[in-house]
Amino acid sequence: MTNRARRLSGNARRYWLALLACAAVALPTAALAQQVLIKFPHDLAPNTPKGLGADYFKKLVAERLPGRAAVEVYPSASLMDDQTSLEALAFGEIQMIAISVSKLESLTKRFQVFDLPFLFADMAQVEAFQNSAVGTRLLGELEGRGILGLAYWHNGMKHLTARKPLHVPADAKGLKFRIQDSDVLLEQIRAVGGNPQKMPFGEVYQALQTGAIDAQENTWSNIYASAFYEVQPYVTETDHGYIGYLVAVNPRFWRGLTADVRGVLEQALEETTAHVNSIARSVNDDARGRVLASGRTTLITLTPAEREQWRAAMRPVWDRFAGGIGPELLKAAGAAP
């Protein structure tokens, strides 16, 4: 190579290095930083309140933190089931969950308050408790276990579906009921003479279809989205309990975010929570209408006297679990002394 060629080669190299340096300076800091990835698995269909909430949160994050943060939603237990997600969150394998409050009793008995039958008369009472000082403090009680609660999302009030009509507690005697992994729900079904079976949500349809179980409890949105009405000819509208979710993150992940990114995520979650909880009733009402319009199940509406029989049969369950829940929570939830 001639001296002139060497000079040209050196000049070209310096030119490109200078150009790259200028480009790097021109890039915003966020573009050079690694994108924050939030893996968010859940166990329900996308058209349920939880599923709609996860997708709404994903949308807000994509709009407000493009290139800086992204949410990957895995519905219908496509990545893992609820119980597995608790451990995965604590170990930092995933970053966010919206888990049924019924499934937290292995970590603390305090969340059992949400499962007490006939404790909450309606969703307004649920919201009043969750928004109280006591309910807000409950969100943070699992941080030491790797689960930092940020919000409560509603599904709705529960009803009973079965292969036979259920008018009074005696009708439930001997029936195999699927329940969530909750000792409160176990005793609730035993209180009416049923045979409770703890089972993951994803296995329920087939178990109902094959007759492995005879009945289950759920909200209208879950009954519709999972097509339980196709294999359960009767729905008894009881409003006997609540299904809702703790939206939680891994605390180490959350505290490790930059303040500006965490602030945007907090605002997005606050707006998502308001959205989910405002649409939960309409989603359940719509699901109820679709189930009844299908003509595949019969609705049983309890008389006041029949409903009182269910309440009286299940009420003793409160006494069994009151000690673990604590008087402060029971009082805030509106439980009678």
Label the model's feature ranges.
Residues 2-19:
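Bacterial N-terminal signal peptides that target proteins for export
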Residues 18, 22, 34-125, 133-337:
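N-terminal secretory/targeting leader peptides
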Residues 27-33:
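Sec/Tat signal peptide C-region and signal peptidase I cleavage site
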